[in-house]
A protein has these predicted regions:
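Short, Lys/Arg-enriched N-terminal segments with co-localized hydrophobic residues
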Residues: 1-23
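Short, charged, low-complexity amphipathic alpha-helix
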Residues: 18-74
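Intrinsic disorder/low-complexity signal
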Residues: 18-20, 108, 115, 230
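A long, low-hydrophobicity, low-complexity, charged/polar interaction segment common
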Residues: 118-243
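Detector for intrinsically disordered, low-structure N-terminal pre-sequences
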Residues: 9-11, 20, 29, 201, ...
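Intrinsic disorder/low-complexity segments
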Residues: 11-13, 26, 221, 241
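Long amphipathic alpha-helices with heptad-repeat character
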Residues: 37-40, 44-47, 51, 87, ...
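Long, charge-patterned amphipathic interaction tracts in eukaryotic proteins
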Residues: 25-42, 73-172
Length: 243
């Protein structure tokens, strides 16, 4: 009897430790998603800074009234080529970071802790409820498992009516989101600086991805970029005008 109790207790302790390890691993992966996203935002900031310097160079050339039109056009072309050359390394680095981000998100979605002690009570609550839970309550449940795609899908499977669609909507497709970000950045990098208008979209998608996994970046994104939305829009307008 004592041996059976000892084995049971040891097994329970081992399971608790395993769950703690899973939770720690999940927390580390979530932080990694945030850290990589911040690195990408900083890289995008370098593209913004480089373009600012480029426009300043063009402005200085245009001010020289003694320069011929042909000379100014040649200087503009040279400045643009230098801009693309100087930022090529930054674009390559961001591509590598986004690949790492996708791998991290894939690992996160596959290893999230569905053995969370709070999961089964919530599954039971949704399964046994005769009708959909109030929005405030289902929102609290979703917040509890924010970023845990597998847990949210498990809850959605037993949820009623609009609770089901609500929970499914909260179960972020991290892999698909990162693929979309990578595609947008590829278009941005391949056409830079003419594709500068894609930069705010990439930034916003990164912020949303982090929020989906429970890490708020918010206004700090502009700090990492070194420019706010107004600055970027101004640069986009200058590029569109050929300035």
């Amino acid at each position: 009897m004592f041996l059976r109790f000892f084995c049971f207790r040891a097994g329970a302790i081992l399971q608790i430790r395993k769950d703690k390890v899973k939770t720690m691993a999940n927390d580390m992966l979530v932080k990694e998603v945030a850290n990589i996203s911040v690195d990408v935002l900083s890289g995008l900031g370098k593209l913004v800074s480089a373009y600012k310097a480029y426009t300043e160079t063009l402005a200085a050339v245009q001010k020289q009234i003694e320069y011929t039109k042909e000379y100014k056009e040649k200087q503009t072309q040279t400045a643009r080529e230098n801009l693309v050359r100087k930022t090529a390394g930054t674009c390559d680095t961001i591509r590598i970071q986004l690949e790492s981000l996708e791998n991290t998100v894939n690992s996160l979605d596959q290893t999230l802790n569905v053995a969370d002690p709070e999961l089964m009570p919530c599954v039971g609550l949704l399964a046994n409820s005769p009708e959909a839970l109030p929005l405030e309550l289902i929102g609290s449940v979703a917040e509890k498992f924010k970023g845990n795609r597998l847990a949210l899908l498990a809850l959605a499977a037993v949820a009623k009516e609009n609770n089901k669609s609500f929970l499914e909507g909260k179960a972020v497709d991290g892999s698909g989101a990162v693929k979309q970000i990578r595609n947008k950045f590829d278009m941005l990098a391949d056409g830079y600086p003419k594709t500068l208008h894609l930069l705010p979209e990439v930034k916003n998608d990164l912020v949303k991805l982090c929020e989906a996994y429970g890490h708020e970046i918010g206004d700090a994104a502009d700090t990492y970029l070194g420019a706010d939305y107004g600055d970027i829009v101004n640069l986009i307008m200058r590029e569109a005008a050929g300035l």
